[in-house]
Structure formats: structure tokens, C-alpha cells
Amino acid sequence: MEKVAIVTIESLNYGNRLQNYALQEVLKSMGYVVRTVHRIYEPKTVKIYVKRMVQNVLQTKAAKFRKFDKKIEFSNVVLKRDEYPIGLEDGFNYFIVGSDQVWNPHYDFVAGKCDFLTFARNNQKISYAASFGVNEIPYERKFEFAEYLKNFKAISVREKQGARIVEELVQRNATVVLDPTLLLDENEWKQVEKKTVCCPKK
């Protein structure tokens, strides 16, 4: 069976965890062995550092997210924004980045080398519902983004504006797709809800 690695934002955020889980389940239903790559974020601004301190205080919330994370099958590999282990590309057939704001140029913990899968071979690089989170890429980063994007085997994005950005930068048509959470049906989510204690109460 072919192996697929998901590269996404890993944080204490309901939407992030749910989209990660949904993409995993969809790929598994297609017959792939799926693993999500662990991420480590190094604080680069005081704002992010303080945010993390607050998150660490919220131990109950963190514990609940860890319980939900047991539903996500992680690899033993750890990525930083611009650092990755040598030979990572040999462990998987494909790498899929998305479906969060992994390409947001204003977030200094993403939109780095790992989020553009620079460690992988060109025929391994795929994005699913990736988001830029902006209407336009800052001028000073356009060349960088173009160099990264032109090497992808397939590009799909979450918003129409994202498709326009891709067309502007690399003259390619990016497919606008659904968020993976919308690919699971109602019964599948009800089963998740029954087994999960971290979801907010109604």
C-alpha cells in the first residue's frame, strides 16, 4: 500500500484538528496508509511566545486535545518551519500539505520550506485545500512563493482567491476544493462525537 504523509498546522484549535482527522480518514478510505507529520514551532515573536504560555496554562484544554489526537495517526518524524530530517522523502510515496492556512505569508510559523514540501521530490508534492489566508502575497515574497509552487505535482486550494494567487505566481490552474471536514458524512461525524470528550458543549 502506498504511504501518504499529511503536513499541516498542529495546534490547540478545533478546526485544525478536525480538518486533519477528516483528511486522514478520506485518504484511508481510498486505500492509503496515512500519517500526519509532527510539527514543532519555535516562537519568533513575543506575541506567539505569550500565546503559548497561556496555552500551557490551559492544561485541561490541552489534555482534551491530546485525547482527540489519538484519533490522528502521527509519524515519528518531526518538522520545524525550515528544518527537516534528511531522507524524509524516501519514507512516503506522497506528501499532502493542507488544508489550513499553511501558506499564510503573515504567519511566521508557517509558509516556510516544510509547508511547501521542499524536502520532497516534485512528483510527491500535493496540496489539498491549502489556504493563503490573504488576497495577495506581499511583493517581497512573491518570487519565493513562485519558486516553491512551480514544483508541485498537483495544487488545490480552499478559496477562489487562492486559485487566483497560484495563477498569478506560476500560471497554473489550481483546483478549488471543499474543506476535508465536508467530505465526511453526518453519520461519520456522529460516531466521532460519541467517542470524543473534547468537543465544546452545545
Identify the residue ranges that each predicted region occupies.
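A nucleotide-sugar donor-handling region in carbohydrate enzymes
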Residues: 82-89, 109, 129-201
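Aromatic- and Gly/Pro-rich donor/ligand-binding loops
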Residues: 4-14, 18-147
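Short hydrophobic beta-strand segments
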Residues: 3-7, 199-202
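A polyampholytic, Gly/Pro-enriched intrinsically disordered region
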Residues: 54-61, 194-202
